[in-house]
Amino acid sequence: MKKRALAIAFLLASLIPSAAQAEEENGWYLGAKFGWSHFNPLKYDMNNSQVNNNDSSIENLSAPIVGLFLGYEFNPYFSLEIENDTNGFFPHLIFQKNNEHIQSNSVQLATKLSYPITDEFHLYTKLGGIVSWNDLSSKNTLKNLFSKESALLPSLSLGAEYIFNETFITRLDYTWKNSVKNIANASIKPALGDAVLSIGWKFGKSDISDMFSSDDSEPLNEQYSVLNENINFPFNSTELKPSSYDKLNKLDDDIKDMQLKNVSIVLLGHADKIGSDEYNQKLSEDRAYSIKNYLASRGFSRDKITVKGMGKLYPLTNQVCRDVVNKPLLISCLAPDRRVEIEVLSDVQ
């Protein structure tokens, strides 16, 4: 029996998702509740009166209930809530000290499992536990919180909510409460219950569609490669050849003739294998910048031209020139490696 009571308490912890799965959006919400409660006054202290435990006429009492709740929505299907409830709240008796009335204050921690019918209308169930503030302040109560005689009241709620404009919450639900002792003895009759109407405010939103959207989805303005060109350079040089100017001018004309939209250009500079890695890295970048400067002089925006030096990492002549030893012959053989690869991107495929 004790294990059954422990299982109820650990149910909350088992349902809490990891923080890594929580959305970055603000999921907090706050609200107030009011309704009618059927509760056992013998479980609580009485204001201005003493109750005889043998008086069965007041063993159960129907009275108003008011409260506040604070919750966090991890996603449209799972939330965690804490509530503070006041049972037996009769405003007209607050200042009448001679009148007997019973009032209890309790705190509830619950998980809220929702089933969205639409983005605005949800059905839900809540599983949790309720303890009075007086019981929480008692060391003996805390010591026996997970025993058969526990003051903890496990609770089950069923309800529906409608959210206006993604922020204003309205709810209607009914909560059954029973003692751990009854549950441990396999009693399924709920002894206590609350019928409640709630209103609240969400500080953020969590759309159902966001649950199934991919983080690595393609951008809306995807660009396509529409033109390519290679420009070769002399050995150990960043100077453009006359033939290179002709190629770049033709590339400019082709872009204009195609009436491309949102054009961007990627320049990848390369060097041959002669020299150190650091020197060739700098040389490859400088070659790419030579072309960027010329294209900018033709009217291209510098912000739309990306430059990257590749050094000697991607040779085209690796197999052809592998056995060449004579340096002049090697320089001539490696000519295709001294290049800048140009790729023109556009929204139009």
Curated annotation (Swiss-Prot):
Subunit structure: Monomer and homodimer.
GO MF term list: porin activity
Domain notes for this protein: The extracellular loops are most variable in sequence, and in some bacteria confer sensitivity to phage and/or colicins.
UniProt xrefs under Pfam families: OmpA, OmpA_membrane
Covalent S-S links between cysteines: 321-333
Site entry (Part of salt bridge gating mechanism), positions: 81, 171
Residues of the OmpA-like domain: 220-348
Localization per record: Cell outer membrane
Hinge-like as annotated region, ranges: 207-218
Signal peptide: 1-22
Keywords: Cell outer membrane, Disulfide bond, Ion transport, Membrane, Porin, Signal, Transmembrane, Transmembrane beta strand, Transport
GO CC annotation: cell outer membrane; pore complex
The protein, known as: Outer membrane protein A
InterPro entries: Bact_OuterMem_StrucFunc, OMP/PagP_b-brl, OMP_bac, OmpA, OmpA-like, OMPA-like_CS, OmpA-like_sf, OmpA-like_TM_dom
Physiological role: With TolR probably plays a role in maintaining the position of the peptidoglycan cell wall in the periplasm. Acts as a porin with low permeability that allows slow penetration of small solutes; an internal gate slows down solute passage.
GO biological process assignments: monoatomic ion transmembrane transport
Membrane topology listed for this record: Multi-pass membrane protein
Family the UniProt entry places it in: Belongs to the outer membrane OOP (TC 1.B.6) superfamily. OmpA family.
Primary localization: membrane
Record-linked CDD domains: OmpA_C-like (cd07185)
Membrane-spanning intervals of the chain: 27-37, 63-74, 78-86, 105-116, 121-129, 154-163, 168-175, 194-202
